[in-house]
Amino acid sequence: MPNPGGNYPGRQIAMGAIEGKPAFAYFVSGRSEKSQKRYATPFLYPEHAIRINPLDMNEKFDQFRHYQAVRIDPETGLLLVSNSQAPNDAIFEAYKFKNMTKEDPFFRAAIILSSIGPEYDNKQKPTARVLGICDPSDIEDGEFDMFLQTKRPYGHQIGFGMNTIADGRMHFVQTYDGNVDYGDFDYTMFVDHKSAFDTSAKTPQDLAEEIYGSSDYIDPTYGVLRVSCIAGVRNGNGPGGWEIAIKNRYRVD
């Protein structure tokens, strides 16, 4: 099965359930050489995060290409996955300290993203910001929140829980429409919960391999587009209870 997001999803977040447990995946693809020559780091315990880094460590820092893609609170299992560094700290704290502030973190996250807007990497075709949250403590309102921010001030959001999703079902959101000459992702599919796929994966490694393997399109101009896939299942193993697996195009020792 090809990637359900098309030949070029850009950056793609999937969230759902595997073996009755919360699960996520983050897939990275790119067209330019600098976008392709990146990798996902192992889990970095000082940061409690996984970063997308350049292969060449002497390469100049680029905030649109080099960032924390996954962040986990080791105590609660709160997980954030995003293609953009800018909103991460504020949104992560909105969820982590919601009991202290007594404010709705879903609403606050939507406001933060709306105020920032899309990434400013391209004036004509800016890249959308996509973000997913898994809050294992929020069973009542639903453990998953997902966000798509294309143009200011309009953003799109969904929320759902483990009790409303079939096992093996993954909802996804992505930066682009799936075409190599990209446009915006169809937000109507997203908000109607129609951007979803079923997986046979049983483990995070299965999920990472499945998504990475299905994204094997080779473009005549840009070549191989897939870069990396990070996947996780909250089965009690790993940081915050998340067992993590990573599939990189390039091996980094």
Residue ranges and their predicted role:
Residues M1-D253:
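Conserved short alpha-helical segments that host acidic/polar catalytic motifs at enzyme active sites
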